[in-house]
Regions:
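Short, charged/polar N-terminal "headpieces" of proteins
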Residues: 1-32
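Generic structural hydrophobic/aromatic packing signal, biased to beta-strands
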Residues: 8-10, 21, 38-42, 76, ...
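Surface-exposed beta-strand edges and their flanking turn/coil or helix-capping segments
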Residues: 21-23, 32-38, 66-68
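Acidic, aromatic-enriched beta-alpha/helix-loop junctions
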Residues: 27-58
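Alpha-helix boundary/N-cap detector
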Residues: 30, 60, 64-67, 71, ...
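Cysteine/selenocysteine-centered motifs that mediate thiol-based redox chemistry or coordinate metal-sulfur cofactors
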Residues: 46-82
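C-terminal charged interaction modules
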Residues: 78-102
Length: 102
């Protein structure tokens, strides 16, 4: 079985607040890419629970965060539809995203 790694490096200030976020995915040809935020969700099937890592740098502006969330929610709507086939719910989610963007 082939394995692949995605590495995320977080630089923290003295108060453990993220100052820099860099990621590498060598299989995709990406090395030391800078990012201002990362949201990771993992599913624990045994516990039937989501595990999350939500980080953003202190330099990220509120308007950037709103755009980031809007784009993330839109992508989640598409992923939800592909994963479940539930077009109606995905459309409801997209309508919320339109409202969110206003």
């Amino acid at each position: 079985m082939k394995e692949s790694e995605i590495k995320i490096k977080i630089s923290l200030d003295e108060n453990k607040v993220p100052e820099q976020i860099h990621w590498t995915a060598e299989d995709a040809g990406e090395r030391d890419q800078k990012s201002e935020a990362v949201l990771i969700s993992l599913w624990d099937a045994e516990q039937q629970n989501s595990l999350r890592i939500d980080l953003w740098t202190k330099e990220m502006k509120v308007d950037q965060m709103k755009t980031f969330f809007h784009q993330t929610l839109m992508a989640m709507s598409d992923t939800f539809e592909r994963a479940t086939g539930d077009e109606k719910m995905a459309d409801d989610m997209r309508r919320f995203c339109q409202y969110f963007a206003e």
